[in-house]
Every structure is written in structure tokens, then in C-alpha cells.
């Protein structure tokens, strides 16, 4: 049972995401021949603007998929109850690429520095049955501060809930985290610091290769000045069991191990089936004997009259003769 649950979890990773077949991760190959997933912010925006086949772009930064968690509370003060929650920074397009299903509010809150999206589970944890829209959430680590800088990125001490989305399944790369915005102009002047990752929702799966080929043909000389030799769009369906790339902390699975567990599960089922058949065959004589024993008493009750019949026959014959 545990094996089947684990195997099902692995094989269905990201399968619940809408438009999964049209989502791609943007990657680049450096002059050392190694593929990596991180980019400088202006490099990403330049690529996105160059293609008419991109329907939506999701940009995240180096906190995504990391173990960084903050204390989140719905009130201030020493008595405020905090919960350790994952915090992710995204652009508004992230919700379009991965198909966030909002149950309250909207995603426009991500256009404001203090706006935030939270999952239903977190909303219930922080606010119970109350409507969370418009209410503040506080990062307890920054209590009393006007703002903080972590890894060169700016954080507000409090955020206003602008939207609540339905929780994603656990076996997806999209986390049920507190999402705060990457602002439009953030680090747009820095072409060399690769803090950002990008997923693209393409118009069709086939347009991905056309997009990268066209971009490389037009920008190869420009990219070489940043030691970028090539670029590619890798399908979301190839990422979890695929070859990991440098500087990508997204979850990955081990397909060989999962396949082995799957075959072990099949083997266990096969052995159980063979054992059941062997046991049934071994019990067949016992069952037959049991059936015979159950039938014999009936026949015994019939034959038990035979002695009486033999005794009655001579004595009863005169009676029968007199009668006749």
C-alpha cells in the first residue's frame, strides 16, 4: 500500500497543473557547457518581449523552492501567534502560467509592494472563518522594522491579503505558500546577477523550439557577451524526472528508483496471487472431505431404517395376509 502511494505520487507529479503540456522552463548553457536555470532579470524580460508565442510568463527568484521560512501572524505584539510558512516571490504572470484558482480577491494585489496571495489552508489557520481580504499579515522576524533586505531583496514588515487561492496538491512544484510580489522594475539595471527563474506558457507546445531558435539566431552575439552559448525551453513534463540543471532548486524525482518500486509492487502482487492459488489448491481436498462429511449423515439417516424393515417384514406378513 505504501509503495503504491509513493509510486502514484511520483508518477503524477505536476499532472494536476492546468495547461501542463504548454508550460516550459527557460534554461541557458554557459561557456563551460553546463545548462542552468537562473537568469538576470533583464535577460528574462528581453527574451519574453521577443516572442509572440508567449501567452504568459512566470518569474520567481532564488527563494523559491528553498527551505527559507518566516514566522507569519495575523496580529502584532508579543502575544501574536506565529506559524512558520514558506514565502515565495513572484510576478503576477506566475498565477496565469500555473492556473491559480482564486476563491476570494484577485491577483492585482501582486502589482502593489504590500500585496500578497495566500492559500485557503493558510487563510483558515490565520483568520478562521473570517474574510481575510484586506487584512494584514505580519512577518514576525521583521516586527517593528520599516522593511528588511534579505539576499539583496526587499521585504515589507506587513502585507495586505489581496487574494486567496485554492490549495495545490502536494505533488506539484507550486507551493501553498505566502506569495509576495516581484515588482516591475526590480533589478532591471543588473544584467549579471542571476537571481531569477522563468516558466513560460506557450501558445502551442510546438512554438517553444521556434521561439528559442529565432531568439538565438537574432541574439547570439549579444548573448556571448554574457557567456551564454545557447538557450532552450524544456517542457514541464520533462523536469521532475529529467536531468537536473545547475542552480535550480526545484524538486526532482528519481525515475529509476520509482520504476524499481513499481516493479517490486507488481512482484509482490504476483507472489500474493501465486500463494493464493497454491493455498486454494492445497485446501481443495480438505474442502471436498468437508462437503462429503456434511452429506454422509443424510444418507445414514435413510439407511438406519433398514434393520427395522428387516425385522418388521416377517412379523408383519401374517397381518398383511389376514388383511388381504
Roles of regions detected by a PLM:
Residues 250-268:
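N-terminal membrane-entry
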Residues 3-71, 80-82, 109, 186-188, ...:
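Membrane-proximal extracellular/periplasmic loop immediately following the first transmembrane helix
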Residues 232, 309-324:
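Small-residue-rich transmembrane alpha-helices
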Residues 1, 295-300, 318, 322:
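A short glycine-centered flexible hinge/capping loop motif at secondary-structure junctions
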Residues 274-312:
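Intracellular coupling helices
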Residues 205, 262, 272:
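Metal/cofactor- and membrane transport-associated sequence elements
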Residues 63-76, 86-104, 116-253:
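Mid-to-C-terminal secondary-structure elements
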Amino acid at each position: 500500500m505504501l509503495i503504491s502511494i509513493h509510486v502514484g505520487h511520483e508518477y503524477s507529479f505536476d499532472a494536476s497543473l492546468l495547461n501542463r503540456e504548454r508550460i516550459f522552463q527557460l534554461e541557458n548553457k554557459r561557456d563551460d557547457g553546463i545548462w542552468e536555470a537562473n537568469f538576470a532579470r533583464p535577460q528574462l524580460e528581453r527574451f519574453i518581449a521577443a516572442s509572440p508565442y508567449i501567452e504568459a510568463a512566470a518569474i520567481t527568484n532564488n527563494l523559491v523552492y528553498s527551505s527559507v521560512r518566516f514566522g507569519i501572524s495575523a496580529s502584532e505584539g508579543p502575544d501574536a501567534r506565529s506559524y512558520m510558512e514558506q514565502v515565495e516571490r513572484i510576478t503576477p504572470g506566475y498565477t496565469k502560467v500555473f492556473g491559480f484558482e482564486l476563491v476570494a480577491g484577485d491577483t492585482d494585489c501582486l502589482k502593489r509592494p504590500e500585496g500578497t496571495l495566500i492559500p485557503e489552508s493558510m487563510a483558515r489557520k490565520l483568520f478562521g472563518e473570517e474574510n481575510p481580504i484586506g487584512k494584514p499579515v505580519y512577518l514576525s522576524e521583521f516586527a517593528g522594522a520599516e522593511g528588511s533586505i534579505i539576499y539583496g531583496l526587499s521585504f515589507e514588515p506587513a502585507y495586505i491579503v489581496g487574494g486567496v487561492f485554492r490549495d495545490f496538491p502536494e505533488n506539484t512544484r507550486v507551493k501553498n505558500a505566502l506569495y509576495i510580489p516581484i515588482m516591475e522594475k526590480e533589478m532591471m539595471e543588473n544584467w549579471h546577477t542571476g537571481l531569477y527563474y522563468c516558466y513560460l506558457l506557450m501558445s502551442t507546445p510546438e512554438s517553444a523550439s521556434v521561439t528559442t531558435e529565432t531568439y538565438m539566431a537574432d541574439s547570439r552575439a549579444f548573448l556571448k557577451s554574457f557567456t551564454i552559448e545557447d538557450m532552450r525551453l524544456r517542457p514541464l513534463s520533462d523536469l521532475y524526472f529529467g536531468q537536473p540543471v545547475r542552480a535550480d532548486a526545484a524538486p526532482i524525482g528519481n525515475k529509476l528508483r520509482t520504476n524499481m518500486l513499481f516493479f517490486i509492487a507488481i512482484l509482490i502482487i504476483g507472489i500474493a496471487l501465486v500463494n493464493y492459488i497454491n493455498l486454494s489448491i492445497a485446501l481443495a481436498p480438505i474442502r471436498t472431505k468437508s462437503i462429503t462429511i456434511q452429506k454422509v449423515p443424510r444418507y445414514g439417516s435413510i439407511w438406519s431404517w433398514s434393520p427395522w424393515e428387516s425385522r418388521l417384514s416377517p412379523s408383519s406378513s401374517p397381518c398383511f395376509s389376514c388383511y388381504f
